[in-house]
Structures are given as structure tokens and as C-alpha cells.
């Protein structure tokens, strides 16, 4: 296979964009395990003066990710994130105004390999979110295990991430006076195993917890489709029933997160590596589904609202797919 190298005379702006995405990918993949490893080494080598104060801090701070987190405007405003956004580039599209006196749950689809569009649009401060949705604060919910990693948890909270636990989502959408948007990548880790270019498979039919929370607190539901998310990486073929998929499913059940076998490009060549491809991401925010507060929703009410959500999600995809290069015959597969 002939290796296609990146040209040497690339503009500085593009080099900065590459650096911004590279650091994000490396942090996404390595910072959590590294922080655990460093903590273990400190304990093994008896650096009490370092790890004892931090473990005490963890004890008192353990539930912060379920109470809105601890974001840092300074970190969220790093110029680094502008270069990150411009690399793809990432776009946010609004289809309807939202009322800032209410709280909302955004269902983000698809997960892709790393949910790049969710992070770029709803976590750091260089998307058009503040202009499109004035009066709102967005909170991107991620797996609770992200907050089990010492030090790493402080970093992910600083960029606005919070836990996706029931307690955390309920806390955000029960805010008096509204103005909160909880962004949940509903397909989760399981959906990343179906993140193949040109495919639109969403794991949603069994995801009903967000519907119950919406009913309990009267939070409106909003489907969000991120076109281009599945084009950022290539993944090893892993159809249902294959030995690769069987192993991946078992590991996902054991560990709580998936291990897709993916690749894209490198820093200095375009053939192989863990850098994402330069593919545009268009994240389209759909119409809100009004939800009447029901403190003790029945299963029938949950099923009805869940069905309405899936119908609105499908409509959103069909209405906008042509604008972003999706063939007319392609449709969503809801699992």
C-alpha cells in the first residue's frame, strides 16, 4: 500500500487544527488510564503527601459530577478549541427557537466513535450555541466511570461534562426557572460498535430512562442528529454474530464501555492512524416535543412518549439528510 504523506507547505492554521484534534484524541484515549496508573504508582511508592490529600478531596467531592459539575470558563474558552472546531469543521443548526424558561433534554445521535459533534457543540465555547440558544446553559452527560479516574475527572468537569446517571440528569432538568439543556448521547457505548461510514444505525428502542425523567420533571425532549459523525473513522467490520462483535459485546457488558476497532489518518500521513478524518459535522437540533409533568408516569405513558420521540427523530433525519449528502434511499435503522 502506497503511503500518502501530508504536504510540507500546509498553512499554519491547519497545523494548529491538527494539533488541537491530536491532543483531544490522546486525552480521550489515554488520560483516564494514565491518571489511574499515576495514582497507583504514588500509592505503591508511598508518596503520602501527594495522594492522601487528593483522596480526601475525592471523598468530599465525589458527588459533584451529579450536581452540575465544576466547569471552568477559562478552559472552555481556550483558543485551542477554536482550532478543534475548525479542523472538521463543526456546525450547529437550529430548526426552532426554544423557551429559556423551560428545561430540555437533547437526545444526540449518533454516538459515532468519540461523539465529536456533541463535545464541539455543547461542551466548549466556540460553537454557535450561545448565539442560537440565548439564555441556556448546556451540560453534556457522559458515563459515570469517567469521574472515577483521579485527576482526569477534574479535567472533564472543567470543560462542562457531567455524569449521565439518573440522579445527575434529574438534577439538571429540575432547575427552577429553566434554562438548562441536558445533552445525552442516547445510543451510548453500545451504539459506537455500529459507527461505520455511510451507516445510520441507532441504539434507541431500549433507551427509555430519559423519557421517564422527562415526564417526571416536565422537561421537553429534543432530537438532535449530527450528520457526518460516523464518517470520522473507519471501523473493522463487526456484523452481529461475528466473533469480533461477540467479544466486543461481552467486553462492553463487563467494563461498561465499548472497544470499537477503528482507525483514520495519522499526523503526517493520510493512510492510517488515530487522528480523525477532516469531515464536516452538521449537528441539527430538531423541534421540541412538549412534555407535561407527570410525577409518577405509567409504563404506557413512557412508551407513548418514547414512540413520539422516535418518530420525530426519524422525521428530522429525513428532512435534512439531502442537505448533507445522504442518498435519498438511506434511512435510519433503529435498534
Curated annotation (Swiss-Prot):
Pathway: Glycerolipid metabolism; triacylglycerol biosynthesis. Its main location: endoplasmic reticulum. Expressed in stomach and liver. One of its GO terms (biological process) is diacylglycerol biosynthetic process. InterPro entries: DAGAT. This is 2-acylglycerol O-acyltransferase 1. GO terms for molecular function: 2-acylglycerol O-acyltransferase activity; diacylglycerol O-acyltransferase activity. The chain crosses the membrane at residues 18-38, 40-60, 132-152. Involved in glycerolipid synthesis and lipid metabolism. Catalyzes the formation of diacylglycerol, the precursor of triacylglycerol, by transferring the acyl chain of a fatty acyl-CoA to a monoacylglycerol, mainly at the sn-1 or sn-3 positions. It uses both sn-2-monoacylglycerol (2-acylglycerol) and sn-1-monoacylglycerol (1-acyl-sn-glycerol) equally well as substrates, and uses sn-3-monoacylglycerol (3-acyl-sn-glycerol) with lower efficiency. Probably not involved in absorption of dietary fat in the small intestine. It comes from the Eukaryota. Belongs to the diacylglycerol acyltransferase family. It is a multi-pass membrane protein. It is found in: Endoplasmic reticulum membrane. It is an enzyme of class 2 (transferase). Its EC number is 2.3.1.22. One of its GO terms (cellular component) is endoplasmic reticulum membrane. It catalyses: a 2-acylglycerol + an acyl-CoA = a 1,2-diacylglycerol + CoA; 2-(9Z-octadecenoyl)-glycerol + butanoyl-CoA = 1-butanoyl-2-(9Z-octadecenoyl)-glycerol + CoA; 2-(9Z-octadecenoyl)-glycerol + octanoyl-CoA = 1-octanoyl-2-(9Z-octadecenoyl)-glycerol + CoA; 2-(9Z-octadecenoyl)-glycerol + dodecanoyl-CoA = 1-dodecanoyl-2-(9Z-octadecenoyl)-glycerol + CoA. Glycans are attached at residues 121, 125, 180. It comes from Homo sapiens (Human). It holds the Pfam family DAGAT. Keywords: Acyltransferase, Endoplasmic reticulum, Glycerol metabolism, Glycoprotein, Lipid biosynthesis, Lipid metabolism, Membrane, Transferase, Transmembrane, Transmembrane helix.
Amino acid at each position: 500500500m502506497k503511503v500518502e504523506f501530508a504536504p510540507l507547505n500546509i498553512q499554519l492554521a491547519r497545523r494548529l487544527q491538527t494539533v488541537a484534534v491530536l491532543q483531544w484524541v490522546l486525552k480521550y484515549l489515554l488520560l483516564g488510564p494514565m491518571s489511574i496508573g499515576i495514582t497507583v504508582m504514588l500509592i505503591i511508592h508511598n508518596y503520602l503527601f501527594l495522594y492522601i490529600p487528593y483522596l480526601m478531596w475525592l471523598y468530599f467531592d465525589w458527588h459533584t459530577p451529579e450536581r452540575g459539575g465544576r466547569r471552568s470558563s477559562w478552559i472552555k474558552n481556550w483558543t485551542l478549541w477554536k482550532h478543534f472546531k475548525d479542523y472538521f469543521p463543526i456546525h450547529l443548526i437550529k430548526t426552532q427557537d426554544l423557551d429559556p424558561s423551560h428545561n430540555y433534554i437533547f437526545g444526540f445521535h449518533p454516538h459515532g466513535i468519540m461523539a465529536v459533534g456533541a463535545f464541539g457543540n455543547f461542551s466548549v465555547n466556540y460553537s454557535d450555541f450561545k448565539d442560537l440558544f440565548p439564555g441556556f446553559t448546556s451540560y453534556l452527560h457522559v458515563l459515570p466511570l469517567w469521574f472515577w479516574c483521579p485527576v482526569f475527572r477534574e479535567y472533564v468537569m472543567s470543560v462542562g461534562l457531567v455524569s449521565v446517571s439518573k440522579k445527575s440528569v434529574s438534577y439538571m432538568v429540575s432547575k427552577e426557572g429553566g434554562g438548562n439543556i441536558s445533552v445525552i448521547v442516547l445510543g451510548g457505548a453500545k451504539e459506537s460498535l455500529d459507527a461505520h461510514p455511510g451507516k445510520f444505525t441507532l441504539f434507541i428502542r431500549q433507551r427509555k430512562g430519559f423519557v421517564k425523567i422527562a415526564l417526571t420533571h416536565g422537561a421537553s425532549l429534543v432530537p438532535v442528529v449530527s450528520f457526518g459523525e460516523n464518517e470520522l473513522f473507519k471501523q473493522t467490520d463487526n456484523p452481529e454474530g461475528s466473533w469480533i462483535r461477540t467479544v466486543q459485546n461481552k467486553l462492553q457488558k463487563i467494563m461498561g464501555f465499548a472497544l470499537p476497532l477503528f482507525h483514520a489518518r495519522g499526523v503526517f500521513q493520510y493512510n492510517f492512524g488515530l487522528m480523525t478524518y477532516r469531515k464536516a459535522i452538521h449537528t441539527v437540533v430538531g423541534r421540541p416535543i412538549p412534555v407535561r409533568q407527570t410525577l409518577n408516569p405509567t409504563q404506557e405513558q413512557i412508551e407513548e412518549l418514547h414512540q413520539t420521540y422516535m418518530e420525530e427523530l426519524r422525521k428530522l433525519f429525513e428532512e435534512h439528510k439531502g442537505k448533507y449528502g445522504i442518498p435519498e434511499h438511506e434511512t435510519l435503522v433503529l435498534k
